[in-house]
């Protein structure tokens, strides 16, 4: 049975750990969206791996890792990541890593534009060039991995891309694109990149009959359509993107991952944000610092109306709660169960667009903290009563089963129900 792991909040929910934990039960792990702007941290024993574009399954020797066509690929960043993991003893070779050859490539000129646009618009991007790369993809002028197979095709595509970028760069006072430098840098990486490249139709054949675990980047509240627009990423993060960004067939399980609280990096609304001692304590105990950006994450209480909305649009079938242990020391824990509108009407499912343009007041369930450690507990029955009540309340409010709970940073610190 194939499964997809998606984030139910603003990213950083712990999807990488859950994918790594589950990967041993699947033949392959497939990244279907995003780029190296989204970091996944996986802890195995005493080693911490900070992955950016490689699927979290790369740490499993007998699992095939796939980068699907929905990913925008920084070629130098990918090779740097591969080289670093190889130095740490991780086995990576053609056959263990497969990349759809119609992936679009993130170039230095994309990063330069990202920095330029962020200075003006301040959307809170990671300045990795992801948005400008997606712009070129949609405008049909981007460079794809398969373009590296032909010197003639690569030069032709670079010429068209440079024509557009030079217009933008002239207006911004930047130097023109040097096509020869871009061509030389891409051509120098060609052989090392293309050894992993496979056309999508061949990927389907290679993975036919094999179980697949799809790994999402970011979270649904950063989705370009369903998130807190315009403070979102440039791609889609949900089930539809699994189909389009991997093109490998249907999914039976949609596993939604959420923290027991919420965090957000950068700009945009965070309705339950705690800009106070609670928020500072969540940030400190949860070590809430962006894997890629290094920025401190804003923290708040768990927002269930938004999660209900995400579950509805993403077709979530089960829930995973992560970082339960971060809440171990709190005397009181708050769960936002609804919003109150202007006329006092309670809203239990709320779209981000409503929150962006209307004033709603968060309504909380106040729960007594359990004040004891949940770290490494292996059975739900052995959790403190307060922790069990917290999980069961979320389960009841969302009307979906909580099938896994992460209660520590390590690979093994996940309990199943």
Swiss-Prot record:
Its main location: cytoplasm. Homodimer. Pathway: Purine metabolism; AMP biosynthesis via de novo pathway; AMP from IMP: step 1/2. InterPro entries: Adenylosuccin_syn_GTP-bd (IPR018220), Adenylosuccin_syn_Lys_AS (IPR033128), Adenylosuccinate_synth_dom1 (IPR042109), Adenylosuccinate_synth_dom2 (IPR042110), Adenylosuccinate_synth_dom3 (IPR042111), Adenylosuccinate_synthetase (IPR001114), P-loop_NTPase (IPR027417). IMP binds at residues 12-15, 37-40, 126, 140, 218, 233, 295. This is Adenylosuccinate synthetase. It comes from Neorickettsia sennetsu (strain ATCC VR-367 / Miyayama). GO terms for biological process: 'de novo' AMP biosynthetic process; IMP metabolic process. SUPFAM superfamilies: P-loop containing nucleoside triphosphate hydrolases. Mg(2+) binds at residues 12, 39. The lineage of its organism: Bacteria, Pseudomonadati, Pseudomonadota, Alphaproteobacteria, Rickettsiales. The keyword GTP-binding applies. Pfam families: Adenylsucc_synt (PF00709). Substrate binds at residues 291-297. Its EC number is 6.3.4.4. Keywords: Cytoplasm, GTP-binding, Ligase, Magnesium, Metal-binding, Nucleotide-binding, Purine biosynthesis. GO terms for molecular function: adenylosuccinate synthase activity; GTP binding; magnesium ion binding.
